[in-house]
Structures are given as C-alpha cells and as structure tokens.
Amino acid sequence: MIDKFRTLSGQVISNKMQKSAIVSIKRLIKHPLYKKFVKKTTKLCIHDENNQCSFGDIVEIRECRPISKTKSWMLVRISKKSLRS
C-alpha cells in the first residue's frame, strides 16, 4: 500500500503549548524570472502527544487529519536533539 501522508522535516522554533509545537520548514525555490534560488520558510503547528520535542530539535513530521483549526501535522520522530537542555 502506498503511504498517502506527506512527510517533512524541520526545526522546532516554539514548544510553549501543551501537546503542540511550531516547526519551521526551510526550502529553496527558483525564481521564475531571475532564475535565482530564494530561501522560503513555512511555519507549521504540529501535534506532539507526549511533549517530547524541545526548542531547536530537528524533527520529522507527517500530515494527518485536522486536529484543530491550525494543526494538521503530527510528530513522527526526533531526528536530532538540540544541544540546549
């Protein structure tokens, strides 16, 4: 069976909410006219059931059903823990 959920990885920029975190996704887009690569950033609110991610962690997230008005992504795993404690 083909997995129908998209998966992305990004950095946690806020975890001050209960069971939620905000993840920043960075990507490069080629400008259509000038052909220069431009950095784009997307902030996504994710569901973190066990409050296990902390500020600065690199996490892997996947798309899921809408959990609230802003949350439709959930934490899959923490790829790299931040050095901050």
From Swiss-Prot:
InterPro entries per the UniProt record, alphabetical: NA-bd_OB-fold, Ribosomal_uS17, Ribosomal_uS17_bact/chlr, Ribosomal_uS17_CS
Domain of life according to the entry: Bacteria
SUPFAM superfamilies in the cross-refs: Nucleic acid-binding proteins (SSF50249)
A molecular function (GO) term: rRNA binding
Keywords, ordered alphabetically: Ribonucleoprotein, Ribosomal protein, RNA-binding, rRNA-binding
GO cellular component, one term: cytosolic small ribosomal subunit
GO BP annotation list: translation
Xref: NCBIfam families: PRK05610.1, uS17_bact
Subunit structure: Part of the 30S ribosomal subunit.
Family listed: Belongs to the universal ribosomal protein uS17 family.
Known function: One of the primary rRNA binding proteins, it binds specifically to the 5'-end of 16S ribosomal RNA.
Protein known as: Small ribosomal subunit protein uS17
Organism: Buchnera aphidicola subsp. Baizongia pistaciae (strain Bp)
